[in-house]
Protein backbone atom coordinates (compact mmCIF):
# COMPACT_ATOMS: atom_id res chain seq x y z
CA UNK A 1 0.00 0.00 0.00
CA UNK A 2 2.76 2.40 1.01
CA UNK A 3 4.65 1.55 -2.17
CA UNK A 4 1.55 2.22 -4.30
CA UNK A 5 1.09 5.61 -2.67
CA UNK A 6 4.72 6.51 -3.31
CA UNK A 7 4.43 5.45 -6.95
CA UNK A 8 1.21 7.49 -7.28
CA UNK A 9 2.86 10.56 -5.75
CA UNK A 10 5.92 10.12 -7.95
CA UNK A 11 3.85 9.85 -11.11
CA UNK A 12 1.77 12.85 -10.07
CA UNK A 13 4.88 14.95 -9.54
CA UNK A 14 6.26 13.80 -12.89
CA UNK A 15 2.98 14.71 -14.56
CA UNK A 16 3.00 18.16 -12.98
CA UNK A 17 6.59 18.69 -14.08
CA UNK A 18 5.78 17.69 -17.65
CA UNK A 19 2.68 19.89 -17.62
CA UNK A 20 4.69 22.82 -16.30
CA UNK A 21 7.35 22.28 -18.95
CA UNK A 22 4.71 22.05 -21.65
CA UNK A 23 2.99 25.20 -20.45
CA UNK A 24 6.30 27.01 -20.30
CA UNK A 25 7.09 25.98 -23.86
CA UNK A 26 3.60 26.94 -25.01
CA UNK A 27 3.64 30.35 -23.33
CA UNK A 28 7.09 31.73 -23.94
CA UNK A 29 7.30 35.48 -23.57
CA UNK A 30 8.45 37.80 -26.36
CA UNK A 31 12.02 37.86 -25.04
CA UNK A 32 12.28 34.06 -24.98
CA UNK A 33 10.74 33.83 -28.46
CA UNK A 34 13.18 36.43 -29.77
CA UNK A 35 16.10 34.45 -28.34
CA UNK A 36 15.15 31.61 -30.68
CA UNK A 37 14.76 33.91 -33.70
CA UNK A 38 17.23 34.82 -36.42
CA UNK A 39 17.24 38.40 -35.16
CA UNK A 40 19.19 37.09 -32.18
CA UNK A 41 22.39 36.54 -34.13
CA UNK A 42 25.25 38.49 -32.63
CA UNK A 43 27.77 36.51 -34.69
CA UNK A 44 26.36 38.13 -37.82
CA UNK A 45 26.45 41.52 -36.11
CA UNK A 46 30.14 41.12 -35.27
CA UNK A 47 31.01 40.17 -38.85
CA UNK A 48 28.99 42.86 -40.62
CA UNK A 49 28.36 45.74 -38.24
CA UNK A 50 31.56 46.48 -36.34
CA UNK A 51 34.45 48.80 -37.12
CA UNK A 52 36.92 46.00 -36.36
CA UNK A 53 35.42 43.88 -39.14
CA UNK A 54 34.32 46.54 -41.63
CA UNK A 55 36.16 49.74 -40.75
CA UNK A 56 34.13 52.68 -42.13
CA UNK A 57 32.17 50.17 -44.22
CA UNK A 58 30.21 49.35 -41.07
CA UNK A 59 28.16 52.45 -41.91
CA UNK A 60 26.54 50.41 -44.67
CA UNK A 61 25.95 47.06 -42.99
CA UNK A 62 25.23 48.26 -39.45
CA UNK A 63 22.00 49.89 -40.61
CA UNK A 64 20.27 46.54 -40.52
CA UNK A 65 22.68 44.23 -38.72
CA UNK A 66 22.81 45.95 -35.34
CA UNK A 67 20.46 47.60 -32.89
CA UNK A 68 22.69 50.65 -32.45
CA UNK A 69 23.20 51.05 -36.18
CA UNK A 70 19.50 50.80 -36.98
CA UNK A 71 18.53 53.32 -34.31
CA UNK A 72 21.20 55.76 -35.49
CA UNK A 73 20.16 55.33 -39.12
CA UNK A 74 16.38 55.49 -38.71
CA UNK A 75 16.06 59.30 -38.25
CA UNK A 76 18.20 59.71 -41.36
CA UNK A 77 15.99 57.26 -43.26
CA UNK A 78 12.82 59.02 -42.15
CA UNK A 79 14.35 62.31 -43.32
CA UNK A 80 14.69 60.88 -46.83
CA UNK A 81 18.24 59.56 -46.92
CA UNK A 82 18.32 55.73 -47.17
CA UNK A 83 22.08 55.62 -47.74
CA UNK A 84 24.74 54.41 -45.29
CA UNK A 85 24.85 55.94 -41.82
CA UNK A 86 26.06 59.53 -42.08
CA UNK A 87 27.22 62.14 -39.59
CA UNK A 88 24.72 64.84 -38.53
CA UNK A 89 26.20 67.23 -41.11
CA UNK A 90 25.56 64.69 -43.86
CA UNK A 91 29.18 63.70 -44.38
CA UNK A 92 30.24 60.07 -44.50
CA UNK A 93 30.58 58.33 -41.15
CA UNK A 94 34.16 57.48 -40.24
CA UNK A 95 35.57 54.98 -37.75
CA UNK A 96 35.64 57.39 -34.76
CA UNK A 97 32.01 58.36 -35.37
CA UNK A 98 30.90 54.74 -35.73
CA UNK A 99 32.86 53.81 -32.61
CA UNK A 100 30.89 56.48 -30.77
CA UNK A 101 27.72 54.68 -31.87
CA UNK A 102 29.05 51.55 -30.10
CA UNK A 103 29.56 49.66 -33.34
CA UNK A 104 32.43 47.69 -31.84
CA UNK A 105 33.01 44.03 -31.05
CA UNK A 106 32.56 44.78 -27.37
CA UNK A 107 29.29 46.68 -27.57
CA UNK A 108 27.43 46.04 -30.84
CA UNK A 109 24.13 44.21 -30.35
CA UNK A 110 21.93 42.32 -32.82
CA UNK A 111 18.40 43.42 -33.72
CA UNK A 112 16.96 43.57 -30.20
CA UNK A 113 13.62 44.77 -28.81
CA UNK A 114 14.70 48.42 -28.81
CA UNK A 115 15.64 48.29 -32.47
CA UNK A 116 11.99 47.83 -33.41
CA UNK A 117 10.20 49.32 -30.39
CA UNK A 118 10.37 52.86 -29.03
CA UNK A 119 8.72 54.38 -25.97
CA UNK A 120 5.78 52.36 -24.70
CA UNK A 121 6.86 49.60 -27.10
CA UNK A 122 5.38 51.51 -30.04
CA UNK A 123 6.74 50.38 -33.39
CA UNK A 124 9.25 52.82 -34.83
CA UNK A 125 7.75 52.64 -38.36
CA UNK A 126 4.16 51.83 -39.34
CA UNK A 127 1.78 51.99 -42.31
CA UNK A 128 4.02 53.55 -44.98
CA UNK A 129 7.77 53.25 -45.33
CA UNK A 130 10.08 56.12 -46.17
CA UNK A 131 12.11 55.81 -49.35
CA UNK A 132 13.89 52.49 -48.90
CA UNK A 133 17.47 51.58 -49.81
CA UNK A 134 15.86 49.60 -52.64
CA UNK A 135 14.73 52.89 -54.20
CA UNK A 136 10.97 52.82 -53.60
CA UNK A 137 8.50 53.20 -50.74
CA UNK A 138 5.75 50.79 -49.66
CA UNK A 139 2.42 52.48 -48.96
CA UNK A 140 -0.33 51.37 -46.55
CA UNK A 141 1.30 48.12 -45.44
CA UNK A 142 0.52 48.43 -41.73
CA UNK A 143 2.95 47.17 -39.13
CA UNK A 144 4.90 45.37 -41.83
CA UNK A 145 6.37 48.73 -42.84
CA UNK A 146 8.92 48.25 -40.07
CA UNK A 147 10.06 44.90 -41.46
CA UNK A 148 10.33 46.39 -44.93
CA UNK A 149 12.83 49.05 -43.88
CA UNK A 150 15.53 46.37 -43.89
CA UNK A 151 14.12 43.40 -45.76
CA UNK A 152 14.70 44.77 -49.26
CA UNK A 153 17.38 44.54 -51.96
CA UNK A 154 19.14 47.61 -50.51
CA UNK A 155 20.94 48.47 -53.76
CA UNK A 156 18.88 51.23 -55.32
CA UNK A 157 16.14 51.24 -57.94
CA UNK A 158 16.87 49.37 -61.14
CA UNK A 159 15.50 50.21 -64.59
CA UNK A 160 13.56 47.16 -65.70
CA UNK A 161 14.17 47.55 -69.46
CA UNK A 162 17.77 48.78 -69.44
CA UNK A 163 20.09 46.98 -71.82
CA UNK A 164 23.11 47.63 -69.62
CA UNK A 165 22.89 48.06 -65.83
CA UNK A 166 26.62 48.94 -65.89
CA UNK A 167 27.28 46.97 -62.73
CA UNK A 168 27.35 43.42 -61.37
CA UNK A 169 25.51 44.28 -58.17
CA UNK A 170 23.37 41.54 -56.61
CA UNK A 171 20.22 41.88 -54.52
CA UNK A 172 20.95 41.86 -50.80
CA UNK A 173 19.88 38.80 -48.85
CA UNK A 174 16.37 38.91 -47.36
CA UNK A 175 14.96 40.82 -50.33
CA UNK A 176 11.32 40.08 -49.49
CA UNK A 177 9.90 43.60 -49.86
CA UNK A 178 10.88 43.90 -53.52
CA UNK A 179 9.07 40.66 -54.31
CA UNK A 180 6.01 41.46 -52.19
CA UNK A 181 5.68 44.89 -53.81
CA UNK A 182 6.61 43.61 -57.29
CA UNK A 183 9.67 45.82 -57.80
CA UNK A 184 13.28 45.69 -58.99
CA UNK A 185 13.20 42.94 -61.57
CA UNK A 186 14.70 43.10 -65.04
CA UNK A 187 12.75 42.17 -68.19
CA UNK A 188 9.35 42.79 -66.53
CA UNK A 189 7.75 46.24 -66.33
CA UNK A 190 7.68 46.97 -62.61
CA UNK A 191 6.62 50.61 -62.87
CA UNK A 192 2.93 49.80 -62.38
CA UNK A 193 1.10 48.06 -59.55
CA UNK A 194 2.38 44.50 -59.14
CA UNK A 195 2.11 44.27 -55.37
CA UNK A 196 0.93 41.03 -53.81
CA UNK A 197 -2.38 40.80 -51.98
CA UNK A 198 -0.29 39.45 -49.10
CA UNK A 199 1.32 42.86 -48.84
CA UNK A 200 -1.50 45.29 -49.53
CA UNK A 201 -4.80 43.49 -48.88
CA UNK A 202 -3.79 41.71 -45.68
CA UNK A 203 -3.73 43.86 -42.55
CA UNK A 204 -0.16 44.50 -41.41
CA UNK A 205 1.33 42.57 -44.35
CA UNK A 206 4.46 40.74 -43.06
CA UNK A 207 3.33 40.89 -39.43
CA UNK A 208 0.05 39.06 -40.06
CA UNK A 209 1.67 35.86 -41.33
CA UNK A 210 4.96 35.98 -39.45
CA UNK A 211 3.59 37.10 -36.07
CA UNK A 212 -0.19 37.44 -35.63
CA UNK A 213 -1.02 33.97 -36.97
CA UNK A 214 1.83 32.16 -35.20
CA UNK A 215 1.98 30.67 -31.71
CA UNK A 216 5.36 32.32 -31.05
CA UNK A 217 5.05 35.77 -32.64
CA UNK A 218 8.54 37.02 -31.82
CA UNK A 219 10.15 33.99 -33.40
CA UNK A 220 8.97 35.56 -36.71
CA UNK A 221 8.48 32.08 -38.15
CA UNK A 222 5.34 31.70 -40.23
CA UNK A 223 3.26 28.70 -39.15
CA UNK A 224 3.12 25.72 -41.49
CA UNK A 225 -0.68 26.02 -41.76
CA UNK A 226 -0.73 29.75 -42.55
CA UNK A 227 -1.83 29.29 -46.15
CA UNK A 228 -4.70 27.03 -45.10
CA UNK A 229 -5.95 29.64 -42.63
CA UNK A 230 -7.05 31.81 -45.53
CA UNK A 231 -7.13 29.56 -48.60
CA UNK A 232 -8.48 26.28 -47.24
CA UNK A 233 -6.92 23.01 -46.06
CA UNK A 234 -5.67 21.84 -49.46
CA UNK A 235 -3.47 24.90 -49.95
CA UNK A 236 0.00 24.53 -48.45
CA UNK A 237 3.13 26.51 -49.20
CA UNK A 238 4.34 23.57 -51.30
CA UNK A 239 1.16 23.87 -53.35
CA UNK A 240 2.37 27.29 -54.52
CA UNK A 241 6.10 26.62 -54.51
CA UNK A 242 6.18 23.60 -56.82
CA UNK A 243 5.63 25.40 -60.16
CA UNK A 244 7.79 28.37 -59.13
CA UNK A 245 10.61 26.04 -58.08
CA UNK A 246 10.45 24.43 -61.51
CA UNK A 247 10.74 27.81 -63.28
CA UNK A 248 13.58 28.85 -60.99
CA UNK A 249 15.46 25.65 -61.84
CA UNK A 250 14.90 26.27 -65.55
CA UNK A 251 16.33 29.77 -65.23
CA UNK A 252 19.44 28.43 -63.50
CA UNK A 253 19.83 25.85 -66.27
CA UNK A 254 19.49 28.54 -68.94
CA UNK A 255 22.18 30.69 -67.30
CA UNK A 256 24.42 27.65 -66.88
CA UNK A 257 23.98 26.76 -70.56
CA UNK A 258 25.21 30.21 -71.59
CA UNK A 259 28.25 29.88 -69.33
CA UNK A 260 29.16 26.45 -70.66
CA UNK A 261 28.84 27.72 -74.23
CA UNK A 262 31.75 30.12 -73.66
CA UNK A 263 33.64 28.24 -70.95
CA UNK A 264 36.81 27.91 -73.03
CA UNK A 265 37.20 31.70 -72.86
CA UNK A 266 37.47 31.54 -69.08
CA UNK A 267 41.16 31.42 -68.15
CA UNK A 268 41.53 33.63 -65.07
CA UNK A 269 39.46 34.62 -62.04
CA UNK A 270 39.87 36.47 -58.77
CA UNK A 271 38.97 33.53 -56.57
CA UNK A 272 37.07 33.93 -53.32
CA UNK A 273 37.63 31.55 -50.42
CA UNK A 274 34.36 31.32 -48.43
CA UNK A 275 36.12 29.62 -45.51
CA UNK A 276 38.58 32.47 -45.03
CA UNK A 277 36.60 35.31 -46.66
CA UNK A 278 39.68 36.21 -48.72
CA UNK A 279 40.35 36.87 -52.41
CA UNK A 280 43.22 35.63 -54.56
CA UNK A 281 43.82 37.50 -57.85
CA UNK A 282 44.82 35.98 -61.18
CA UNK A 283 43.94 32.38 -60.38
CA UNK A 284 44.33 30.26 -63.50
CA UNK A 285 41.28 28.28 -64.60
CA UNK A 286 41.06 25.63 -67.30
CA UNK A 287 37.69 26.59 -68.70
CA UNK A 288 37.39 23.29 -70.54
CA UNK A 289 37.07 21.57 -67.15
CA UNK A 290 34.01 23.58 -66.05
CA UNK A 291 31.03 21.23 -65.81
CA UNK A 292 28.42 23.52 -64.28
CA UNK A 293 27.76 26.53 -62.06
CA UNK A 294 25.84 27.72 -59.05
CA UNK A 295 24.70 31.32 -58.64
CA UNK A 296 25.11 33.35 -55.46
CA UNK A 297 26.55 36.67 -54.29
CA UNK A 298 29.75 37.66 -52.50
CA UNK A 299 30.44 41.16 -51.24
CA UNK A 300 27.25 42.43 -52.82
CA UNK A 301 28.26 41.23 -56.29
CA UNK A 302 26.78 38.52 -58.49
CA UNK A 303 29.03 35.49 -58.10
CA UNK A 304 29.34 32.25 -60.03
CA UNK A 305 30.54 29.07 -58.37
CA UNK A 306 32.39 27.25 -61.13
CA UNK A 307 32.10 23.49 -60.74
CA UNK A 308 35.19 21.73 -62.04
CA UNK A 309 35.56 18.22 -63.40
CA UNK A 310 37.82 17.25 -60.48
CA UNK A 311 35.10 18.16 -57.97
CA UNK A 312 36.56 21.50 -56.94
CA UNK A 313 34.45 24.64 -56.75
CA UNK A 314 35.83 28.07 -57.63
CA UNK A 315 33.98 31.16 -56.42
CA UNK A 316 34.37 34.32 -58.48
CA UNK A 317 32.45 37.56 -58.73
CA UNK A 318 31.08 37.85 -62.24
CA UNK A 319 33.16 40.92 -63.09
CA UNK A 320 36.35 39.02 -62.21
CA UNK A 321 35.86 36.16 -64.67
CA UNK A 322 38.29 37.00 -67.49
CA UNK A 323 39.89 35.65 -70.63
CA UNK A 324 43.44 36.60 -69.56
CA UNK A 325 45.27 37.54 -66.35
CA UNK A 326 45.90 41.09 -65.17
CA UNK A 327 44.72 44.36 -66.68
CA UNK A 328 44.81 43.14 -70.31
CA UNK A 329 42.23 40.50 -69.49
CA UNK A 330 38.70 41.19 -70.69
CA UNK A 331 35.66 40.15 -68.71
CA UNK A 332 33.92 37.20 -70.29
CA UNK A 333 30.50 38.53 -69.30
CA UNK A 334 30.13 42.28 -69.90
CA UNK A 335 27.53 44.17 -67.87
CA UNK A 336 25.39 44.44 -71.02
CA UNK A 337 25.22 40.66 -71.38
CA UNK A 338 21.66 39.52 -70.55
CA UNK A 339 23.19 36.90 -68.25
CA UNK A 340 23.93 39.67 -65.72
CA UNK A 341 20.29 40.76 -65.52
CA UNK A 342 19.11 37.16 -65.53
CA UNK A 343 21.41 36.35 -62.62
CA UNK A 344 20.03 39.34 -60.65
CA UNK A 345 16.50 38.01 -61.14
CA UNK A 346 17.53 34.50 -60.15
CA UNK A 347 19.15 35.76 -56.94
CA UNK A 348 16.17 38.02 -56.19
CA UNK A 349 13.88 34.99 -55.98
CA UNK A 350 16.52 32.92 -54.19
CA UNK A 351 16.96 35.60 -51.51
CA UNK A 352 13.23 36.21 -51.13
CA UNK A 353 13.15 32.61 -49.86
CA UNK A 354 9.40 32.14 -50.25
CA UNK A 355 9.67 30.61 -53.74
CA UNK A 356 6.50 32.32 -54.90
CA UNK A 357 4.45 32.42 -51.71
CA UNK A 358 5.00 36.14 -51.14
CA UNK A 359 3.90 37.15 -54.65
CA UNK A 360 3.16 34.22 -56.96
CA UNK A 361 1.97 36.24 -59.97
CA UNK A 362 4.93 38.61 -60.04
CA UNK A 363 7.39 35.77 -59.44
CA UNK A 364 5.99 33.63 -62.24
CA UNK A 365 5.77 36.46 -64.77
CA UNK A 366 9.28 37.65 -63.98
CA UNK A 367 10.83 34.20 -64.31
CA UNK A 368 9.06 33.58 -67.61
CA UNK A 369 10.13 36.98 -68.95
CA UNK A 370 13.72 36.25 -67.95
CA UNK A 371 13.71 32.89 -69.70
CA UNK A 372 12.41 34.55 -72.86
CA UNK A 373 15.17 37.16 -72.67
CA UNK A 374 17.99 34.61 -72.70
CA UNK A 375 18.72 33.66 -76.34
Where are the regions that the model predicts?
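Bacterial N-terminal signal peptides
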Residues: 10-18
Amino acid sequence: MKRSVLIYIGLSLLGLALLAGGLQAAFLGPAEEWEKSKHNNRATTLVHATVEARSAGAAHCARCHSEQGFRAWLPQLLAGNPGPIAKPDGSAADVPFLTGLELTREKAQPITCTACHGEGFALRVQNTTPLLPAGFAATAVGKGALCMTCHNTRNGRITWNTEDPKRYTAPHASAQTDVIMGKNAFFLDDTGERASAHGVFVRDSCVSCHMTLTKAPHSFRAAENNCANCHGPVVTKEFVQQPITELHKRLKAAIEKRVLAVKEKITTVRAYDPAKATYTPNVAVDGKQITGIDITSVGGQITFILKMADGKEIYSQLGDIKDAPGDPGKVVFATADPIVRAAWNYILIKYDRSMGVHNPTFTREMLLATLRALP
